[in-house]
C-alpha cells in the first residue's frame, strides 16, 4: 500500500499542471489547436484515474480551456466528483469549474443538490462559502426550491462571512424560485440591523434590487431605511437607500416631506460627487411627487439646479453627463428653472464627447418655447453645417424635427419658416433621414391647411431641381423628399401656379433612375396634375392645349411601363390606358375634365397611430386559424416547387437576337437622332444616363456637366429660413408695440397721469400669436375603435414573479419545503408536548417573574412595531381608534415568542378525520378543570384580565390564537351536503376555493352506488348561468356534459371533482344540473338520469386563512371595511362548540378568544377580508362583522344565522 502511494506521488510529479499547459500553449502558437486537442486527450485519461488530486488537476486545466472558448460540458460528471472532494483545495477547483460551465440545461446538475446541502452545513466556513459562491452562478429553479431553507438558515450563522454570502445569494434564489420571497423576507429584514456592516450592506443591496422593479411592496420598510439613512456613514449604503427612496416617493407622497430635510442636509454637507448626484436625483423625484403639495419647494429646486450646474461645468466627462441627465428630469416639471441655463446647455453642443452632445440635444428638446424656438433651431442648423461624422449630423437633424414637431407643433408660430427649414435640410449630404424629412413635409401640408399654398410652391421648386437631389452620391437617403414633394404637388394641385411646368418636371427621363416606390408616387400624382390641367384648359376653352398635355403623357408614360418595379409597371399601364381613352374622347370634342377629376375627389386625412390595432375583430373571425392547412413534411418533400407564372429557366435560356454589325448600329443611331430632333418634347440639353452610353462609340462630343456636390446646393426660388427669422422678429415687435399702445390707452383712461413700467413688459408664450391662422386637421380613427391598451409586458421578465405582497400573513402553503425523516411529524405528538408542562409545575414560584418579563418584552415589541408602522411614522399623531371597534381592539393581544421559537401557524382543518385526530391530541380533563378554576379565581375587572398575558404553562391562549379550539370534545361534523338521491345513486358535494385562483372553485362530488347494478358512462352536466360556468374539456360546447372518470360497482362510492368559473362571489346562487348514467344488471342495461340543484353559498367562496392579532388590528384600523351585525336568541350550545361550528361550516379561523368573546377572520378567493366579533350572552349570540364588500357580508351573516339557529 505504501509503495502504491509512493508510486502515485512520483507519477503526479510528471503530470502537466496548469502552468505547464499555459507554457505549452504559448510555445505552440502556429499549431495551437492541435496542441490543445492533444492536451484534452491527456486530460480525458487523467479524469479516468481514481486519484482525486489528478482529477482536480485535470479539471483545473479544463477550466482554463473553457476560458479560451472550448466546450467542457462533457466533463460535468467529473467536475461534480471534484466538488465532492473532502480537501478544500480540490473542492474549490470543482466549484470554480461548475460556476463557469454549469447552466440550467446541464443534465447532471440535479446530482449536486445533496453535495451542496452537505457543504452548506459543513463546520468549515470556507467549505460553506465556496458552496454559496458556486451555487450563485448555476442556481436553477429546482436547486433554489430544494436549498432555499438551508440558505435561509445560514442567514442566522454566527460568522458574518457566511451571513453576508447567504443574504446575497438569496437574491438569485428569489429570481429562480419566487415563492421563497415571503417566507424569507422577515429574516432578510432582520439583517438590515445586523451588527456587521458587511451583512447590513448585503441586505440593503438585495432589498434595493428587489424594490427597483416592484417598489410598492417595500413601502412598509421606509421607516427602517430612513433610520439607516440618518445613522449610516457608509456612502455606498447611503446611495442604495437614497435610490430606493427615489422609487418609493412617487407611491407615497407623504414620504417626500420626511425626506426633503435630510436630503438637503446631505447635499450641503457631502463632498462625494456620487452621493451628491443620488441626493439631487431623489430630491427631484420628491418634488415631482409633491408637485404643488409643498408650498416652498422653489428653494430646493434652485439648490438642485445650482449643484447640477457645478457637475456640468466639471472637467470630468462622467459628471458632466450625469449632470445633464439629472437636469432633464427637472426639466419635465420645472422647465423655467432649467431654461435660465440655456447658455450652458448650448455650450455642451461644442463638446468633443459625442454622448454629451447628444444628451445636451435631449435637454434642448424640453427647453424650447414659442419665444426661443427659432433661435435654438438656428444654432442647431449652424452645428449641422459644422458637424463631423454622419451619426451626429443625423442626430441633429432628428432633434431639429423633434423639437419643431413636438406636442402637435405647439411652439411653431410661422409654418413658412418651418417648411423652409425642412427644405434646407434636404441639402444635407450623406443623411439617412430623408424619409423623416419627407414625413414631416407630408404631415405639415396635410394638417395645416393655411400653409398648403406655400408648401406646394416649395415642393414644385424642389421637383424642378430634382436632378440635383437624385444625382447625389447618397441619393438613396435624401431622395425620399421627392416622394413627399410629388405627393403634395399632386394632392394639392389647385395651389400650383404653373402645373404644366411641374408635370413636365415629373415626366423627365431622369426620374426613371429613382427608387421604385418614388417612381410609383410620381406616376400616381402625374394623373392628379393632369386632371387639374385638363380642368383649367377646358374652362378656358383651350382644347388644343389639353390635347397637347394628353399627348405628352402618352409619349412619356411608356418609360414607366418598362420599369423593373412591378408596382410602377402596373400603375403606369393603368394610367396609360386611361389617358389613351381620354385622348379618343378629346378627338370627338367630348369634355372629360370633370370625370377625370372625380377620380381624386375628397381629402386624405392623417390616420391615428395604432389605428389598425384598434379595429375591432369581427365576430366569428379567428385570426390564429389557418387559411390553408400547411402541407405535411412528407408531402412537401415529394412535390417539386413550381414556378408561379412560367418556367423561369426557359425564359432566361431562350436564344438571344444576333448582335448587329457596325453599319446597322450607325443606321440606328442616325434614325434615333432624327427622331429626337423632330420631337418637340425631347429635352436636348438633358444629359442621358451615363450607364446607358458609357461604352458606346462616338459619344465623346456629348457635353457632360460635372456637379461639385461639396458646395452647398441652393435651389432657386427657395427663401432661406434666416429671412423668415427676421420677418418673424419684425412681426413680433410690431405686435408688442400694438399691445403696449392698447395697454397704455387703457391705463390712461383708468388713471390719468400715472405710468406703470410700460417699458418693462415681458413677453410670454401666450402673448405670441401665430403668423397665420392654423387649422390643424385631426387624425382619423376606424369605426367602432376599441380603447387602446398598453403594450403587454414581457412575459419572460424574471422580476414579474417577484411582485408579491410582503405584508400579507404567511399561509401554510407558502412554507418552504424542508426535508424530514419519515418519523419527523410523529416526534411532535401532544403527549410529548405535555412533558414541559409537568416540569413547569415544579417552577411555580417563578411564574410571576416570568409574567413580568413577558410584559416588558411585549411592551418593547409594541414600541418597535409602532416605529416600523408606515402610517404611524408618516403621520404627526397616531390614528385614533374607531369607537365602534374599541372593544375588539382592546382585546387584541400580541403573542410573544421566545428567541429561537418558530412563529405559530394556523392550519386548515376542513375534513372530519383531521378534526377527530385533533380531539385525540387534547390534554387531560384534569388539566382543563384546573384551568377553568384558575379562570374563575381571576378578578372580574375586564381591563386587568385583558392586559394580562397568559403564562407559558397555560395552553388556552396560544392554541386559540392559532385558529384551533382545544376544550371539550366536539360533535362529529361533515362538510359534505346531500345533492340528490334516487334508488340507484346518492350524491353529496362540497365546494372548495383557492387563494391562488380568484375566479375558480372546485366542486367535489361523492357518488355512492346504492343499487345492485353496475353504473357506468356517467356524465355530469350543469346549465351555465351568467355568473357561473362549468369548465368543460377543450372543444366541447355549452350543452356537452363532463364525463365522470370512473365506474361504480354495487355498494362502492368514489369522488369526482369539477371546476367552475365564477364571476361574482357576493351573492349565493343555484345551478340546475343532471347526472346521466347507464345502469347495467343481469336483466340488461337502462339509461337513467338524476336531476339536482347545485347550491353555491357565499361561504363556498371563503378559504380558511390564519391571521394574527397585530395584522387583524391593522385591518380594522384601516377604515376600508363595511360593518353589519346579527343577533340570534335561544342558543344553548357551549361557546367553545359554537366557535368550532362557525370555524368548520363557514371556514373562519379564531384570531383570539377572551372568555365568551372571540375575534375571527376569513378571506374570500377574490381577496375580500371578513372579520367577525362573536359574543355570547346567556341565551343569545351576537355577531358583528366587517368586510370589504357589504353585499358579501350581509349574505354571509344570513347564512351564519341559519347555522346558529340549529345550535
UniProtKB/Swiss-Prot annotation:
Keyword Disulfide bond part of the UniProt annotation: no
Keyword vocabulary terms for this entry: Acetylation, Coiled coil, Cytoplasm, Golgi apparatus, Membrane, Phosphoprotein, Protein transport, Repeat, Transport
Placement of HEAT repeats on the sequence: 34-71, 142-179, 180-216, 218-254, 257-296, 298-336, 337-373, 375-409, 521-558
Keyword Phosphoprotein: yes
Region of interest called Disordered, as start-end residue ranges on this chain: 630-695, 731-970
SUPFAM superfamilies, per the entry: ARM repeat (SSF48371)
Biased composition (Acidic residues): 777-794, 952-969
Positions of transmembrane segments: none
Pfam family of the protein (one): AP3D1
Membrane topology reported for the UniProt record: Peripheral membrane protein
Location in the cell: Cytoplasm; Golgi apparatus membrane
Any GO BP annotation: neurotransmitter receptor transport, postsynaptic endosome to lysosome
Family named by the database record: Belongs to the adaptor complexes large subunit family.
Function: Part of the AP-3 complex, an adaptor-related complex which is not clathrin-associated. The complex is associated with the Golgi region as well as more peripheral structures. It facilitates the budding of vesicles from the Golgi membrane and may be directly involved in trafficking to lysosomes. Involved in process of CD8+ T-cell and NK cell degranulation. In concert with the BLOC-1 complex, AP-3 is required to target cargos into vesicles assembled at cell bodies for delivery into neurites and nerve terminals.
Cited PANTHER family: AP-3 COMPLEX SUBUNIT DELTA-1, DELTA ADAPTIN-RELATED
Protein's UniProt name: AP-3 complex subunit delta-1
Organism this protein belongs to: Bos taurus (Bovine)
Amino acid at each position: 500500500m505504501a509503495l502504491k502511494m509512493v508510486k502515485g506521488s512520483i507519477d503526479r510529479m510528471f503530470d502537466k499542471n496548469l502552468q505547464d499547459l499555459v507554457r505549452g500553449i504559448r510555445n505552440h502558437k502556429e499549431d495551437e489547436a492541435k496542441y490543445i486537442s492533444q492536451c484534452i486527450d491527456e486530460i480525458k485519461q487523467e479524469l479516468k484515474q481514481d486519484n482525486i488530486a489528478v482529477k482536480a488537476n485535470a479539471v483545473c486545466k479544463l477550466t482554463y480551456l473553457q476560458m479560451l472558448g472550448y466546450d467542457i460540458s462533457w466533463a460535468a460528471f467529473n467536475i461534480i466528483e471534484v466538488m465532492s472532494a473532502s480537501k478544500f483545495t480540490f473542492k474549490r477547483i470543482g466549484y470554480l469549474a461548475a460556476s463557469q460551465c454549469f447552466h440550467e440545461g446541464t443534465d447532471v446538475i440535479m446530482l449536486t443538490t445533496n453535495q451542496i446541502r452537505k457543504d452548506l452545513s459543513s463546520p468549515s466556513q470556507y467549505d460553506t462559502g465556496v458552496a454559496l459562491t458556486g451555487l450563485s452562478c448555476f442556481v436553477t429553479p429546482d436547486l433554489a426550491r430544494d436549498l432555499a431553507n438551508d440558505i435561509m438558515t445560514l442567514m442566522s450563522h454566527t460568522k458574518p462571512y457566511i451571513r453576508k454570502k447567504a443574504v446575497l445569494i438569496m437574491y438569485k434564489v428569489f429570481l429562480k424560485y419566487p415563492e421563497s420571497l415571503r417566507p424569507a423576507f422577515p429574516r432578510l429584514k432582520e439583517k438590515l440591523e445586523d451588527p456587521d456592516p458587511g451583512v447590513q450592506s448585503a441586505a440593503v443591496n438585495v432589498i434595493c434590487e428587489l424594490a427597483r422593479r416592484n417598489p410598492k411592496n417595500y413601502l412598509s420598510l421606509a421607516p427602517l431605511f430612513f433610520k439607516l439613512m440618518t445613522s449610516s456613514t457608509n456612502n455606498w449604503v447611503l446611495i442604495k437607500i437614497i435610490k430606493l427612496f427615489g422609487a418609493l416617493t412617487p407611491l407615497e407622497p407623504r414620504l417626500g416631506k420626511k425626506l426633503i430635510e435630510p436630503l438637503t442636509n446631505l447635499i450641503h454637507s457631502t463632498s462625494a460627487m456620487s452621493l451628491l448626484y443620488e441626493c439631487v436625483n431623489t430630491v427631484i423625484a420628491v418634488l415631482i411627487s409633491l408637485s404643488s403639495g409643498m408650498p416652498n419647494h422653489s428653494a430646493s429646486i434652485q439648490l438642485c439646479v445650482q449643484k447640477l450646474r457645478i457637475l456640468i461645468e466639471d472637467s470630468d466627462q462622467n459628471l458632466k453627463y450625469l449632470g445633464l441627465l439629472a437636469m432633464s428630469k427637472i426639466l419635465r416639471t420645472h422647465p423655467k428653472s432649467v431654461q435660465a441655463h440655456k447658455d450652458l446647455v448650448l455650450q455642451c453642443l461644442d463638446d468633443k464627447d459625442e454622448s454629451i452632445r447628444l444628451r445636451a440635444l435631449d435637454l434642448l428638446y424640453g427647453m424650447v418655447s414659442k419665444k426661443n424656438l427659432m433661435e435654438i433651431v438656428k444654432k442647431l442648423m449652424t452645428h449641422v453645417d459644422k458637424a463631423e461624422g454622419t451619426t451626429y449630423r443625423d442626430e441633429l437633424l432628428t432633434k431639429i424635427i423633434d423639437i419643431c414637431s413636438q406636442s402637435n407643433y405647439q411652439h411653431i408660430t410661422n409654418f413658412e419658416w418651418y417648411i423652409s427649414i425642412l427644405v434646407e435640410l434636404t441639402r444635407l449630404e450623406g443623411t439617412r433621414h430623408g424619409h423623416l424629412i419627407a414625413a414631416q413635409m407630408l404631415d405639415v401640408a396635410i394638417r395645416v391647411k393655411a400653409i398648403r399654398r406655400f408648401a406646394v410652391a416649395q415642393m414644385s421648386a424642389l421637383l424642378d431641381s430634382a436632378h440635383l437631389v437624385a444625382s447625389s452620391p447618397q441619393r438613396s437617403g435624401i431622395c425620399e423628399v421627392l416622394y413627399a414633394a410629388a405627393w403634395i404637388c399632386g394632392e394639392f394641385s389647385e395651389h400650383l401656379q404653373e402645373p404644366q411646368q411641374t408635370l413636365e418636371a415629373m415626366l423627365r427621363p431622369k426620374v426613371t433612375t429613382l427608387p421604385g416606390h418614388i417612381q410609383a408616387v410620381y406616376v400616381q400624382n402625374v394623373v392628379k396634375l393632369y386632371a387639374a390641367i385638363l380642368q383649367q384648359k377646358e374652362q378656358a376653352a383651350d382644347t388644343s392645349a389639353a390635347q397637347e398635355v394628353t399627348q405628352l403623357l402618352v409619349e412619356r408614360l411608356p418609360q414607366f411601363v418598362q420599369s423593373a418595379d412591378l408596382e410602377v409597371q402596373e400603375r403606369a399601364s393603368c394610367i396609360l390606358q386611361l389617358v389613351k381613352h381620354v385622348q379618343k374622347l378629346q378627338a370627338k370634342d367630348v369634355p372629360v375634365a370633370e370625370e377625370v377629376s372625380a377620380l381624386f375627389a375628397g381629402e386624405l386625412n392623417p390616420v391615428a397611430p395604432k389605428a389598425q390595432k384598434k379595429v375591432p375583430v369581427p365576430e366569428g373571425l379567428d385570426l390564429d386559424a389557418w387559411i390553408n392547412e400547411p402541407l405535411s413534411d412528407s408531402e412537401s418533400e415529394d412535390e417539386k416547387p413550381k414556378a408561379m407564372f412560367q418556367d423561369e429557366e426557359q425564359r432566361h435560356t431562350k436564344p438571344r437576337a444576333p448582335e448587329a454589325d457596325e453599319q446597322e448600329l450607325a443606321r440606328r443611331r442616325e434614325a434615333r437622332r432624327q427622331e429626337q430632333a423632330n420631337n418637340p418634347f425631347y429635352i436636348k440639353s438633358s444629359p442621358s444616363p451615363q450607364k446607358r452610353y458609357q461604352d458606346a462609340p462616338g459619344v465623346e462630343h456629348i457635353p457632360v456637366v460635372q456637379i461639385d456636390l461639396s458646395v452647398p446646393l441652393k435651389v432657386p426660388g427657395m427663401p432661406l429660413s434666416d429671412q423668415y427669422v427676421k420677418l418673424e422678429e419684425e412681426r413680433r415687435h410690431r405686435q408688442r408695440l400694438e399691445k403696449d399702445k392698447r395697454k397704455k390707452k387703457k391705463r390712461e383712461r383708468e388713471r390719468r397721469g400715472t405710468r406703470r413700467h410700460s417699458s418693462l413688459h415681458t413677453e410670454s408664450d401666450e402673448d405670441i400669436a401665430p403668423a397665420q391662422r392654423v387649422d390643424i386637421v385631426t387624425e382619423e380613427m376606424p369605426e367602432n375603435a376599441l380603447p387602446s391598451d398598453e403594450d403587454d409586458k414581457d412575459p419572460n421578465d424574471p422580476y414579474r414573479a417577484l411582485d408579491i405582497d410582503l405584508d400579507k400573513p404567511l399561509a401554510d402553503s407558502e412554507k418552504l419545503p424542508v426535508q424530514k425523516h419519515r418519523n419527523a411529524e410523529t416526534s411532535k405528538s401532544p403527549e410529548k408536548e405535555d412533558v414541559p408542562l409537568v416540569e413547569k409545575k415544579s417552577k411555580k414560584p417563578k411564574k410571576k417573574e416570568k409574567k413580568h418579563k413577558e410584559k416588558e418584552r411585549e411592551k418593547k415589541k409594541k414600541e418597535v412595531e409602532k416605529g416600523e408602522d408606515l402610517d404611524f411614522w408618516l403621520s404627526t399623531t397616531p390614528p385614533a381608534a374607531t369607537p365602534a371597534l374599541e372593544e375588539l381592539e382592546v382585546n387584541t393581544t400580541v403573542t410573544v415568542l421566545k428567541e429561537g421559537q418558530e412563529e405559530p401557524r394556523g392550519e386548515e382543518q376542513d375534513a372530519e378525520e383531521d378534526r377527530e385526530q385533533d380531539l385525540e391530541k387534547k390534554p387531560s380533563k384534569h388539566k382543563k378543570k384546573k384551568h377553568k378554576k384558575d379562570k374563575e379565581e381571576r378578578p372580574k375587572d375586564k381591563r386587568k384580565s385583558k392586559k394580562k398575558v397568559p403564562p407559558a404553562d397555560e395552553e388556552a391562549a396560544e392554541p386559540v390564537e392559532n385558529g384551533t379550539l382545544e376544550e371539550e370534545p366536539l360533535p362529529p361534523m361533515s362538510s359534505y351536503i346531500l345533492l340528490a338521491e334516487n334508488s340507484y345513486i346518492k350524491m353529496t358535494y362540497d365546494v372548495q376555493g383557492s387563494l391562488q385562483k380568484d375566479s375558480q372553485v372546485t366542486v367535489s362530488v361523492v357518488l355512492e352506488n346504492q343499487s345492485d347494478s353496475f353504473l357506468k358512462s356517467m356524465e355530469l352536466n350543469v346549465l351555465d348561468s351568467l355568473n357561473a360556468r362549468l369548465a368543460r374539456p377543450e372543444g366541447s360546447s355549452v350543452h356537452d356534459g363532463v364525463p365522470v372518470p370512473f365506474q361504480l360497482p354495487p355498494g362502492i362510492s368514489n369522488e369526482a371533482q369539477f371546476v367552475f368559473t365564477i364571476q361574482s362571489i357576493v351573492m349565493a346562487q343555484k345551478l340546475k344540473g343532471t347526472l346521466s348514467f347507464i345502469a347495467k344488471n343481469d336483466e340488461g342495461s337502462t339509461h337513467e338520469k338524476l336531476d339536482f340543484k347545485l347550491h353555491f353559498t357565499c361561504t363556498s367562496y371563503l378559504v380558511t386563512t390564519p391571521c394574527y392579532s397585530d395584522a387583524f388590528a391593522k385591518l380594522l384600523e384601516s377604515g376600508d371595511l363595511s360593518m353589519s351585525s346579527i343577533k340570534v336568541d335561544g342558543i344553548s350550545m357551549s361557546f367553545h362548540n359554537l366557535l368550532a361550528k362557525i370555524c368548520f361550516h363557514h371556514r373562519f379561523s379564531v384570531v383570539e378568544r377572551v372568555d365568551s368573546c372571540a375575534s375571527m377572520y376569513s378571506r374570500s378567493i377574490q381577496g375580500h377580508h371578513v372579520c367577525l366579533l362573536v359574543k355570547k350572552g346567556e341565551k343569545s349570540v351576537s355577531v358583528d362583522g366587517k368586510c370589504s364588500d357589504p353585499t358579501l357580508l350581509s349574505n354571509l351573516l344570513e347564512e351564519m344565522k341559519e347555522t346558529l339557529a340549529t345550535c
